[in-house]
């Protein structure tokens, strides 16, 4: 009965626990990878800039995060594509050849 009342009045401890656990996991992943939130935000902005040369994307729906699995950290980007641009800047040849 108490659990029902807590859920009814908006104090769902199970979901609060999940949110807190996810936040802690994200903090630990960022800490282990040595990536600050500022660096991740800069990376996100650079990704938007580069990808926008080729595709129209939904920047509001774009998500960039770090995940940690088995001692490996991965950058995960979820980028909603609206359409492919038909014209884009041409890639220049490098000034020197190896």
Swiss-Prot record:
UniProt feature coiled coil, ranges: none
SUPFAM superfamilies linked: Cell division protein MinE topological specificity domain
Keyword annotations: Cell cycle, Cell division
Keyword field contains DNA repair: no
Keyword Cell inner membrane: no
GO biological process terms on file: cell division; regulation of division septum assembly
Xref: InterPro entries: MinE, MinE_sf
Function (record text): Prevents the cell division inhibition by proteins MinC and MinD at internal division sites while permitting inhibition at polar sites. This ensures cell division at the proper site by restricting the formation of a division septum at the midpoint of the long axis of the cell.
Sequence similarity: Belongs to the MinE family.
Name of the molecule in the record: Cell division topological specificity factor
Organism of derivation: Moorella thermoacetica (strain ATCC 39073 / JCM 9320)
């Amino acid at each position: 009965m108490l659990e029902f009342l807590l859920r009814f009045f908006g104090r769902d401890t199970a979901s609060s626990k999940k949110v807190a656990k996810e936040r802690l996991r994200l903090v630990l992943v960022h800490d282990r990878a040595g990536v600050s939130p500022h660096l991740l935000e800069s990376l996100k902005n650079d990704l938007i800039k580069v990808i926008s040369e080729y595709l129209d994307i939904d920047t509001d729906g774009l998500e960039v995060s770090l995940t940690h699995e088995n001692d490996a950290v991965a950058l995960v980007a979820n980028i909603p594509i609206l359409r492919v641009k038909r014209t884009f800047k041409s890639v220049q040849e490098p000034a020197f050849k190896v």
